Swiss-Prot record:
GO annotations of cellular component type: ribonucleoprotein complex; ribosome
Primary role: One of the early assembly proteins it binds 23S rRNA. One of the proteins that surrounds the polypeptide exit tunnel on the outside of the ribosome. Forms the main docking site for trigger factor binding to the ribosome.
SUPFAM superfamilies: Ribosomal proteins S24e, L23 and L15e
GO biological process terms on file: translation
Protein name: Large ribosomal subunit protein uL23
Cell wall biogenesis/degradation listed as a keyword: no
Keywords, ordered alphabetically: Ribonucleoprotein, Ribosomal protein, RNA-binding, rRNA-binding
GO molecular function, one term: rRNA binding
Similarity field: Belongs to the universal ribosomal protein uL23 family.
Taxonomic lineage from the root: Bacteria, Pseudomonadati, Thermodesulfobacteriota, Desulfobulbia, Desulfobulbales
Cystine connections: none
HAMAP family: Ribosomal_uL23_B
Keyword rRNA-binding: yes
């Protein structure tokens, strides 16, 4: 991906993500499924002006959903666990 604004889709606001942020200083983002770790790191550093130490990614499979007799499926998506460098501030208070 060439556009850094197309890489990040938004933060993942779950209980697990909040615990990871408090304990390890990690932030979880929903990202474009075809983006790689280098693009994710570059996008976060440019958009939020923070230093990224490490990026881990996980591809999430779409779930099967049923409405009456009709069976469908949610889209597959990707999330990134981003570890911030020591001394970086908590920037998710602004989100």
């Amino acid at each position: 991906m060439k556009n850094i604004y197309g890489v990040l889709k938004g933060p993942v606001l779950t209980e697990k993500a909040a615990i990871l942020q408090e304990i390890d200083g990690q932030v979880v983002f929903k990202v474009h499924p075809k983006s790689n770790k280098i693009e994710i790191k570059r996008a976060i550093e440019l958009m939020f002006d923070v230093k990224v130490k490490d990026v881990r990614t996980a591809s999430m499979r779409g779930k099967e959903k049923r409405v009456g007799k009709t069976v469908g499926q949610t889209k597959e998506w990707k999330k990134a666990y981003v570890s911030l460098a020591e001394g970086e501030i908590n920037f998710t208070d602004e989100i």
